[in-house]
Swiss-Prot record:
The keyword RNA-binding appears for this protein: no
UniProt gene name: fj
Reported consequences of knocking out the gene: Mutants show reduced growth and altered differentiation only within restricted sectors of the proximal-distal (PD) axis in the leg and wing.
Organs and tissues of expression: In the eye disk, expressed in a gradient ahead of the morphogenetic furrow, high at the equator and low at the poles of the eye. In the leg disk, expressed in concentric rings, possibly corresponding to segmental boundaries. In the wing disk, expression is localized in the wing pouch; low in peripheral regions and high towards the center.
Post-translational modifications: Proteolytically cleaved to yield a secreted protein.
GO molecular function: protein serine kinase activity; protein serine/threonine kinase activity; Wnt-protein binding
Biased composition (Low complexity): 206-219
Source organism of the structure: Drosophila melanogaster
Topological region Extracellular: 100-583
GO biological process: cell-cell signaling; establishment of imaginal disc-derived wing hair orientation; establishment of ommatidial planar polarity; establishment of planar polarity; imaginal disc growth; imaginal disc-derived leg joint morphogenesis; imaginal disc-derived wing vein specification; Notch signaling pathway
Enzyme Commission number(s): 2.7.11.1
Disulfide-bond pairs as recorded: none
Stated name of the protein: Extracellular serine/threonine protein kinase four-jointed
Length: 583
């Protein structure tokens, strides 16, 4: 019995001695890095007594200390490498450029002319533009004089690229401009797109210096064309087409308001809901109908402004109201419904003109020659006189046949009688050219005052995409075939809608006015009287006097904001006349 108990006690001690060994072995299996040191010793001596004598817990503790030291050394080495890389980068990126590398020259070396020409054709980048200081801001006249191409910058709505002709050396330059909130411009650096042509300067100056001796027949002949260097002379004024007089306007207003009975509406007269109105007596008119009354106001008040300035190139117009309950509109009820016109809406009725043909832009207003002054008139006079002298000399049969078959200038006056002597024909051709230019001077002044977007400015704006558009007929401009009268059509964008878009299109308006230095004296005199009497008051009085109470109920008068802008633009035109007189 005693032996059995001693045997069981010995077995329990042996089991207790093996339990720590099992824990150490399991721990060694979980930590693979420690098993590399202790595992071979355990596998080589499987005897339990020898395992207990080797003290495995002490070996495990030493292994963990070695692993911690190794990790600590790795962290320190990593931090030291990061610090060394940072110091090296600082030295390479900052210290070396400041002290170690040579500086570039302040001014680049002179390049050959061929290389300069190659550099000049590189496209401009908006981020390379450096505008001048605010104190050196320029006016539209200073920026756009002699400019022949404007291109809106897509990335910057207030900026545009300007190409202009340098009159000093005949070269073409390009630069950026930026419009400021004050309406002035900041100009970027210029770059030359073409070579200087100094050989052109002397002939140009010579041609612009005609002799003023009273014995010179050329000067005597020019005296009737230009007066005081800025006005068209009596020869041109007396030859101008009569146009539409004040009595035509009075009779048309009476006809529309009292006598006219609309019988039907027909398609025509432009876009959208405009219609051709046919009256009972066969009279026709173009009806301008818009959902927005601003364009109706612009059309009728632009016409009133033309009347106050004695510009006879505007067809008679009158404002009325669509009301099928009245005898004037009752017969056209079906056509009005089909046209989707609404009752009690204002319309502008303009007398229909049947003998109209397209009118082009004269050469003096096309790029690169967009200017008209006394020198241009003198040069044109001398040129046509030299042609007349050449034609007066006897020619052979083949030369006469060739001259007879040569085509005339596109979009120019063709109403010259082919009877009479060659001298009379040449004089008639010269006067016809000057008549067209005189009417264009009124057109430029009128469109600038009302800020019309739908005529020449339309061509100028689209010139950046279509270079041939300036040679095409002008938008909303026509010519009467018989009288050669230019008719200014479609002025609905004037005075209101055009004023809202001045920030975008003012450069194009100023471009035309700044290059005009020959005006009609009656127009400028009327403009001075209008400025003194008050443009807003005169326009509103004319509106009250010529429209019915029904029209005034649905069509507002001219806003004060438009009147203020109009007065500013009147001063701008008068300032341009004064500047031309001093030049």
């Amino acid at each position: 019995m005693y032996d059995i108990k001693r045997l069981e006690a010995g077995q329990q001690k042996l089991q207790q001695a093996q339990q720590p060994l099992g824990l150490d072995l399991s721990g060694q299996q979980q930590q693979l890095t420690c098993s590399v040191i202790t595992a071979p010793e355990h596998r080589a001596n499987p005897n339990p007594s020898s395992i207990s004598q080797s003290n495995p817990s002490e070996a495990t503790h030493m292994t963990l200390l070695t692993l911690r030291r190794r990790r600590s050394l790795q962290r320190r080495a990593c931090l030291l490498s990061i610090l060394a890389a940072f110091v090296f980068g600082m030295a390479l990126g900052v210290v070396v450029p400041m002290f170690g590398l040579p500086r570039h020259q302040d001014s680049p070396p002179d390049l050959p002319e061929e290389q300069i020409q190659m550099v000049a054709v590189e496209p401009l980048s908006s981020y390379r533009v450096e505008f001048i200081k605010e104190t050196d801001e320029l006016s539209a006249e200073q920026v756009f004089r002699n400019a022949f191409h404007l291109e809106q910058d897509k990335d910057a709505p207030d900026s545009m690229v300007v190409k202009k002709l340098d009159t000093n050396d005949g070269s073409i330059k390009e630069f950026h401009v930026q419009r400021t909130a004050s309406g002035r411009y900041r100009k970027g650096p210029e770059r030359r797109l073409s070579k200087k042509m100094p050989e052109r300067v002397q002939p140009q100056e010579t041609s612009r210096s005609p002799t003023t001796s009273p014995t010179n027949p050329t000067s005597e002949h020019q005296a009737g064309f230009i007066e005081e260097d800025v006005y068209w002379g009596p020869t041109v004024e007396q030859a101008l087409p009569k146009g539409f007089a004040a009595k035509d306007q009075v009779s048309w207003e009476r006809f529309v308001g009292e006598q006219g009975r609309v019988v039907r509406l027909e398609q025509g007269c432009g876009r959208m809901q405009n219609r051709m109105v046919v009256f009972a007596d066969g009279t026709r008119a173009c009806a301008r109908y818009r959902q927005n009354t601003d364009q109706i106001q612009g059309e009728i008040f632009s016409y009133y402004l033309g009347q106050l300035l004695n510009i006879s190139n505007l067809a008679p117009s009158a404002a009325t109201v669509v009301d099928t309950s009245t005898p004037n509109w009752a017969a056209a009820l079906g056509d009005i419904t089909q046209a989707q016109w609404k009752e009690r809406r204002p319309v502008v009725l303009t007398r229909w003109l049947s003998d109209l043909e397209p009118a082009g832009i004269p050469q003096p207003f096309q790029p690169l020659e967009r200017h008209l002054n006394k020198h241009d008139v003198w040069n044109l006079t001398r040129h046509m006189q030299s042609e007349r002298q050449a034609q007066s000399q006897p020619h052979g049969l083949l030369k006469r046949l060739g001259a007879a078959s040569s085509p005339g200038s596109a979009h120019q006056s063709n109403a010259i009688e082919e009877t009479g002597t060659g001298t009379e024909t040449a004089n008639g051709a010269l006067v016809q050219r000057l008549i067209e230019l005189a009417q264009w001077s009124d057109l430029i002044v009128f469109d600038y005052l009302i800020a019309n977007l739908d005529r020449v400015v339309n061509n100028l704006y689209n010139f950046q995409w279509n270079a041939d558009i300036m040679a095409a007929p002008a938008h909303n401009l026509a010519r009467q075939s018989a009288s050669q009268l230019l008719v200014f059509l479609d002025n609905e964008s004037g005075l209101l809608h055009g004023y809202r878009l001045l920030k975008k299109y003012e450069a194009y308006h100023s471009l035309l006015l700044d290059n005009l230095c020959v005006f009609r004296r009656p127009t400028i005199d009327a403009l001075r009287r209008l400025r003194a009497a008050g443009a807003g008051r005169r326009l509103r009085d004319l509106f009250e006097r010529t429209t019915s109470a029904g029209v005034r109920d649905v069509l507002p008068s001219l806003p004060d904001k438009s009147v203020k802008i109009l007065v500013e633009r009147i001063d701008r035109v008068l300032g341009q006349v004064q500047k031309c007189q001093g030049s």
